[in-house]
Amino acid sequence: CAAKASPINLTGSEVQGLIDGADYYAKAVIPAGTYTGQKKDATTFGVKATVVTSNMVESDLVYLVVKAVFENFDDFRKQHPAFSSLKKEDMIADGLSAPLHEGAVRYYKEVGLM
């Protein structure tokens, strides 16, 4: 990113209170080098990312999208520094903002994640 920004550390009891109060918040680290001139990691918090769809989307399509991401997980994690610490097991249960789609559940069960 070419932006001239300096991420700041956001920690402390107020931040921990936010994290404890909502499953969709988590501690996060912005890796050094994410922004031009950023020499150190920045410890902060953020919203957990979730891919959300409608239950009106065909189950087979959702199944194929989830399968493509999970079967190419190492490449997926390289697409953005924020993805680098993702773990498959956490992605299907930790801080979900919507129920899992039946197509996703089918894939997770097929590969033994559920």
Indicate where each model-derived feature is located.
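Pocket-lining segment of extracytoplasmic ligand-binding domains
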Residues: 1-51, 56-57
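Segments of small-molecule ligand-sensing domains
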Residues: 42-114
